[in-house]
Amino acid sequence: MAITEIPYADYADLFIEKESHGGVFLSTCADGKNNTMTIGWGSIGFMWGKPVLTVMIRKSRYSYELIEKNPEFTVSIPIHDDFKKALGVCGSKSGRSIDKFKEASLEIMAGQKVTPPVIKGTGLHLECKVRYQQTLSADNFNQQLCDKWYSDQDWHVLYYGEIVSAYVEK
């Protein structure tokens, strides 16, 4: 399988489409343990003179524990709909108790410039190094959104990751 580096912005629309309609895989790694989860919220753009991918991870998630130890992550975007079942598994099970890669029949490939792996066969990959993070809180938050998404106080942490590599599998 060949890997072709791409300008990250060339596939920004695809990232947004897939993320908002079914999700994408976010993978982390620390202490020799890999994990992946399905995410459906985030943004892609340009900040601090760098390409940036912003993702959200709740503090209750196993991925949060790993990214706090190793501030790198990958996002694998399924170009085709072959990963619907795997996205369901990775969005509903915890990596603390199972190997989600095995459970969802996912193959991994080593990241090119970061420690976390990418999901083989998805087609599009973004590798990121965290440059800033911030925990959401009720302060200055729209009350309706706060009531809807954070009534249990399980806040997201926003991770602003510099995109250090973007590529497609061919």
Model-derived segments and spans:
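Active-site-proximal mixed secondary-structure blocks
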Residues: M1-I39, S43-K170
